[in-house]
């Protein structure tokens, strides 16, 4: 069965330009509200997304292990062809979700990274240093543990799988604890996860890319430079950036880089506008786009990604070194790396814990960071072809994410006991 649709990569530009909920054109915010409002919306959106993500993952896993498992795998490979004149691009639905829709998710990730670096918690080096140290530890130790288990084996290429944090899943778990968890820990988790995402993007671009086409790479660079030029020229309408987004995705695809990298590159071209500290500031193009993309990401893209990627059959399965490496990396390497490197930052006086965060709270944060899910599944799909190794990685990711979530809830419940009314 082949489904034909016109328009090439127009979906990338269309979703970029369309917002399902209107963003207010002008608001009057005090400086502190300007800083807190984006995080409050971010936390609520990510927490809701995490709960939907969990449901989609459970559905995929149950479907892949049910008597109707064949229909699940048939749906993943259902071909979809996009055409424009003599040009065609044909792949299974699984590919379109992972390579096109996830480019929009990476666009949102890029927007969040840019916002945090410019006007958020990461804009001051000392404030960012605790999250940076924790993120580094939370990436290096899981990769090291995985490599220790899989060195020299067929699964050695999966060292990047346990490095990243699923911020939506983690904040969804955190939301289950209600208001007992301190605001400082929530902000620190968001900052750490955003830095983790940045690390994952770099890992994908540098280590999971092969066979570069230099001509297409040059065209991609030219398109990106044009986008930066539009930003510098003060173009604030999102339409031209949507067109460039489609061109950037196509040239990135042709270059040999994973096409999701186009989302991050496009995010860097979107104008942020006035400083957030200014009162009576009109929402910038970046804020409008971030606000518009959040519902698409939370309730369409990420659930579809979970549905198409979390379905792993355990029939006849056995414990594999890849599974063990992922589990150890996420539930031991992550919290150990986060706490150890945060402690190092404090000892070096490069950072200090927020007043409302304790070391038991940091351990709970490290366990939340061990919920790898989305990024881990994504990198696993790049590291391994379809088959036993990828299934082993998925099983490890699902197992570790559940164990890390349960452990985090237990630790944080004790670290932040409910206050008597």
Curated annotation (Swiss-Prot):
It holds the Pfam family Na_H_antiport_1. GO terms for cellular component: plasma membrane. GO terms for biological process: regulation of pH. The keyword Transport applies. It is a multi-pass membrane protein. The keyword Nucleotide-binding does not apply. It catalyses: Na(+)(in) + 2 H(+)(out) = Na(+)(out) + 2 H(+)(in). It is found in: Cell membrane. InterPro entries: Na/H_antiporter_dom_sf, NhaA. The chain crosses the membrane at residues 48-68, 93-113, 129-149, 157-177, 187-207, 215-235, 253-273, 299-319, 326-346, 364-384, 392-412. One of its GO terms (molecular function) is sodium:proton antiporter activity. Keywords: Antiport, Cell membrane, Ion transport, Membrane, Sodium, Sodium transport, Transmembrane, Transmembrane helix, Transport. Its main location: membrane. Belongs to the NhaA Na(+)/H(+) (TC 2.A.33) antiporter family. NCBIfam families: NhaA, PRK09560.1, PRK09561.1. HAMAP family: NhaA. Na(+)/H(+) antiporter that extrudes sodium in exchange for external protons. This is Na(+)/H(+) antiporter NhaA 1. It comes from Deinococcus geothermalis (strain DSM 11300 / CIP 105573 / AG-3a).
